[in-house]
Amino acid sequence: MRTAVAELPDEDFARPSGCAGWRVRDLVCHLIIDAQDVLITLVTPAETEPTRNAVTYWEVAETPPTGDDPLDALTVRMAAAYEEPWLLKFHLDDVGSAAGRAAELADPGLWVSTRDEVFTAGDYLSVYVLEWTLHHLDLIAHLPGAAEPPAESLAGAREMLERIAGAAFPTSWSDTDALLVGTGRRAPTDAERAELGELGELPAKFPLFLG
């Protein structure tokens, strides 16, 4: 993800992203906040047992985000304050690389606390594999030729999304298509809708609007 952002030309930061109401620069600012959250959480140990795991972390909404949330609006203002794309690139690389090192050093079994919930560090970091993979797809949604997420990340994110839904996508679907359709980032084609229909109750489970 950091590499994909670092390679973007400046003009791409003003283009729309796959997140409602956000340009690429706003999404990159959100990724910086995410990386800071990882750093803070990994050094916030908990004394009580985990209350959630990588699957139950997610709240599934009935409608897609609109971009009108106050925190979303704050992110837009913060992104604008950077003014120059290189500053966003620098800050993401700086904080993101630190978060990556912290993740590598963390004991997966360590109990950590965030948002008034307790997780193992391993489960908490698994949450971010899904989140950042989806946001990588958001980043390149309108940027043909931009670097795609690693295959390993796509496969892991798909598996996690299927666990959240309690159902699997058609095996003929690519991981990218499963993630985009499964989270409502794009509508299924007629052929995809037909495949979903052949799987019984599966269509009723998707899309999942994760929050």
Regions inferred by a protein language model and the residue ranges of each:
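Structured surface interface patches that mediate subunit assembly and partner/cofactor docking
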Residues: V43-V55, A81-E83, F90, A102-G211
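Active-site-adjacent scaffolding segments
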Residues: R2-W111
